[in-house]
């Protein structure tokens, strides 16, 4: 991995901080945010997703995360290109939706 790729990975890692507890949980199979302030988590074997309030997951934090993931994958996410389909450096799928495609302040799964 070259220096640029390493630095992008560090920035993504920092941007993932609001959802870190669920990323590190081996029972979690899906993490979704349908806007600022809350996360929905699906755990292996559970019948429904769990809702969690996450005050640090602001509109800015969602946009920042999407921009970092986009940069890592050689893409951009902005008002002209509000949809992002990429992967995190560790291989997890990342789908992002930013305004104006959503009015909720951004979303990801």
What are these model-derived regions, one by one?
Residues 38, 42, 48-109:
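P-loop NTP-binding catalytic core
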Residues 1-53:
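N-terminal anchoring/assembly modules that precede and organize ATP-driven motor systems
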């Amino acid at each position: 991995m070259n220096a640029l790729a390493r630095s992008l990975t560090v920035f993504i890692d920092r941007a993932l901080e609001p959802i870190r507890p669920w990323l590190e949980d081996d029972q979690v199979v899906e993490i979704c945010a349908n806007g600022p302030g809350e996360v929905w988590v699906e755990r292996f074997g559970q019948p429904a997703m769990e809702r969690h309030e996450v005050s640090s997951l602001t509109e800015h934090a969602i946009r920042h995360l999407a921009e970092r993931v986009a940069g890592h994958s050689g893409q951009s996410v902005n008002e002209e290109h509000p949809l992002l389909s990429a992967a995190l450096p560790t291989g997890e799928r990342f789908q992002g939706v930013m305004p104006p495609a959503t009015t909720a302040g951004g979303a990801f799964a």
